[in-house]
From Swiss-Prot:
The keyword Amino-acid biosynthesis applies. Interacts with gutamate dehydrogenase RocG. Residues 18-37 bind DNA. One of its GO terms (cellular component) is protein-DNA complex. Activated by alpha-ketoglutarate and inhibited by glutamate and by RocG. It holds the Pfam family HTH_1. GO terms for biological process: glutamate biosynthetic process; regulation of DNA-templated transcription. InterPro entries: LysR_subst-bd (IPR005119), Tscrpt_reg_HTH_LysR (IPR000847), WH-like_DNA-bd_sf (IPR036388), WH_DNA-bd_sf (IPR036390). CDD domains: PBP2_GltC_like (cd08434). This is Transcriptional dual regulator GltC. Induction: Induced by glucose, repressed by arginine, less protein accumulates when grown in the presence of glucose and arginine (at protein level). It comes from Bacillus subtilis (strain 168).
């Protein structure tokens, strides 16, 4: 069994067409067909079956694909480790982040890191809270910046970088807009603008409202921070957001108000796999991030 055969197999399985796989891999169609046939002969099973003009995986082919993907991911990771061992200052760091940390925090820390390690490259993946945790566990990314920092996973370790307050964001013409602080219960009759189901910032907002003694009336949803802030600015409702999402400014026609009760904070940090050694460049970045935030007064 050869790596070439496995890569051909994965490409055909994804495209369900030998000629398309051949075009993408820049090899002859006959070469792919021959290698797939050799693989099936070695395994003594049929991996594909024809369905019209396309070919589909057989049940055993689907099972084989799962293991091939896992094996190829491990092999690619091993090659990356060797490359970085030979030159640890020229690696690639694959880091994930949520939308709430995209505008200021991530660019700031990467820019500072690049000053010391100019030849290290970054592959950035934005995703939801649960997606980022699974991506670290599955080796799709090396590290993830996120909040809150998870503490209940046996295969993930996290380091808290800072703790931040949660604020109420209301339209400029809101009755409470001129108050210096707000009790969250005072917003119980307002309509809320939140992220959709499955987003951790939605869960945070709902849990905070429950601590205040009410369930928020969610009238509008937005899938990113700009949408949420824009809807509040347009008078569609109020929302709750962490301090770091404001990036030193408050959106036009809105007011950011500290919540006096309940006083809720969230942790923000960086996570990495617990039982897997990071490549040198990824480990350098992990250690750099921890030191970077320990020196920043604004995050203390």
């Amino acid at each position: 069994m050869e790596l070439r055969q496995l890569r051909y197999f994965m490409e055909v399985a994804e495209r369900e067409h030998v000629s398309e796989a051949a075009d993408h891999l820049h090899v002859a169609q006959s070469a792919i067909s021959r290698q797939i046939a050799n693989l099936e002969e070695e395994l003594n099973v049929t991996l594909f079956e024809r369905e019209g003009r396309n070919i589909k995986l057989t049940p055993i082919g689907k099972e084989f694909l799962i293991h091939v993907k896992t094996a190829m991911k491990a092999i690619d990771y091993a090659k990356e480790q060797i490359d970085e061992y030979l030159d640890p200052h020229r690696g690639t760091v694959k880091i994930g982040f949520p939308t709430s940390l995209a505008s200021q925090l991530l660019p700031t820390v990467i820019s500072a890191f690049k000053e010391e390690y100019p030849h290290v490259e970054f592959l950035l993946r934005q995703g939801s809270y649960k997606f980022l945790i699974e991506a670290v566990r599955n080796r799709d990314i090396d590290l993830a910046l996120l909040g809150p920092v998870p503490t209940n996973f046996s295969d993930i370790t996290g380091k808290i970088l800072f703790t931040e307050k949660i604020y109420a964001l209301v339209p400029l013409n809101h009755p409470l807009a001129k108050q210096k602080t707000v009790h969250l219960i005072d917003l119980r009759n307002d309509q809320f603008v939140l992220f959709p189901e499955g987003f951790v910032l939605r869960e945070m907002a709902i849990d905070t409202c429950k601590q205040a003694g009410f369930a928020p009336l969610v009238s509008t949803e937005g899938e990113d921070l700009d949408a949420i802030k824009g809807l509040v600015s347009a008078g569609m409702g109020v929302t709750l957001l962490p301090e770091s999402t404001f990036a030193e400014t408050t959106p036009r026609f809105t007011v950011k108000i500290p919540i006096e009760f309940p006083q809720v904070k969230r942790t923000v940090g960086i996570i990495k796999p617990k039982n897997r050694e990071l490549a040198p460049s990824a480990n350098d970045f992990y250690e750099f991030v921890i030191q970077f935030f320990s020196k920043l007064e604004q995050y203390q």
